[in-house]
Amino acid sequence: MRRNCNAGFKSPVQSPSSSSSGRGSEYSLQKEVSELQGKEAALDQEIAQLESEGFSMAELEEHITLLHEYNELKDVGQMLLGRLAVLRGVTTKELYAEFGMNLED
């Protein structure tokens, strides 16, 4: 099978103008913007509700930061247990038992 190397390239990706009419695309974008504005309003309302219940955004951000730090430390601990298990020729499950840890820890 021989192909013409001088033929023009035809992209499999359709350009936005060729995939749908201008009006349909504009309507679709307006609908999407409207839906996003509705979601934003709902989230703003939820934030206001939480703040009225005594929650603060700063406290939430601090909590999220601490959760990220905890998860990173947990990942490092699991990696070290895995390496130790390989060096000892045992399973990590056995190491968890040796150190008095639950598998869910």
Curated annotation (Swiss-Prot):
Comp. bias intervals (Low complexity): 11-28
Region (Disordered) location: 1-31
Gene Ontology CC terms, in alphabetical order: nucleus; Swi5-Sfr1 complex
Keyword Metal-binding appears in the UniProt entry: no
One Pfam family per UniProt: Swi5
A single BP term in Gene Ontology: double-strand break repair via homologous recombination
Coiled coil (residue ranges): 28-54
Subunit (UniProt): Component of the swi5-sfr1 complex.
Protein name per UniProt: DNA repair protein SWI5 homolog
Organism: Xenopus tropicalis (Western clawed frog)
Gene name tied to this protein: swi5
